[in-house]
C-alpha cells in the first residue's frame, strides 16, 4: 500500500468516526504537543551550523585539483564533439574519461595541481601573516585551534571551494556557449 492510498483510507475512516472515537486521538495529539513544547523550552540549537562563516574576497583562491585541470582542458573538446550534451552529461563524460585515464597520463595534471597547491599554501600563509600583524612579528602564521574546530572550518572551506569551482565551471561553460 502506498502512502497516498493509505492517506485516503485514513481520511475516509476519520470522517466516519464518532466524536467519542476521535476524542482518543485528539487527546493523544494534545499530549504529544505538550511534550513537544516542554522539550522545545530546553532545546539549544547546535552552535555554528546555521551561521555562515565570513569569507574574505581578497583571500587567495584554492587551486583546482588535478581532475579540474583535466576538465578545463577536455571540456571544450567534448563540447565540440557533442554540442547537444547538457552540463551534467559533459561532467559525466569527463568523469568517465578521468577514471579511464592511465596513472602515467594523469601525472602532468597531478604535478601541476601540486605546484598550484604549494603556491596557494605560500600565498595563504603570507595572507594570514599580513592580516595578523602580531602573529607576523612573532613568526606565527596560524593560530592554534582545537582539532574539532579546525576540522569543521576545513570542511566549510572545502564546501565553499567546491561551490566556487562549480561556479567557475558554469561561467567557463557560459563563455564557451557565447563563443559558439
Swiss-Prot record:
SMART domains (UniProt xref): HMG (SM00398)
Motif placement: Nuclear localization signal (NLS) 1: 1-8
Residues recorded with modification Cysteine sulfonic acid (-SO3H): 10, 71
Segments of this protein annotated with the region LPS binding (Lipid A): 45-61
Membrane topology, from the record: Peripheral membrane protein
CDD domains named in the record: HMG-box_HMGB_rpt1 (cd21978), HMG-box_HMGB_rpt2 (cd21979)
Complex formation: Interacts (fully reduced HMGB1) with CXCL12; probably in a 1:2 ratio involving two molecules of CXCL12, each interacting with one HMG box of HMGB1; inhibited by glycyrrhizin. Associates with the TLR4:LY96 receptor complex. Component of the RAG complex composed of core components RAG1 and RAG2, and associated component HMGB1 or HMGB2. Interacts (in cytoplasm upon starvation) with BECN1; inhibits the interaction of BECN1 and BCL2 leading to promotion of autophagy. Interacts with KPNA1; involved in nuclear import. Interacts with SREBF1, TLR2, TLR4, TLR9, PTPRZ1, APEX1, FEN1, POLB, TERT.
Function statement: Multifunctional redox sensitive protein with various roles in different cellular compartments. In the nucleus is one of the major chromatin-associated non-histone proteins and acts as a DNA chaperone involved in replication, transcription, chromatin remodeling, V(D)J recombination, DNA repair and genome stability. Proposed to be an universal biosensor for nucleic acids. Promotes host inflammatory response to sterile and infectious signals and is involved in the coordination and integration of innate and adaptive immune responses.
Name of the protein in question: High mobility group protein B1
Annotated organism of origin: Cricetulus griseus (Chinese hamster)
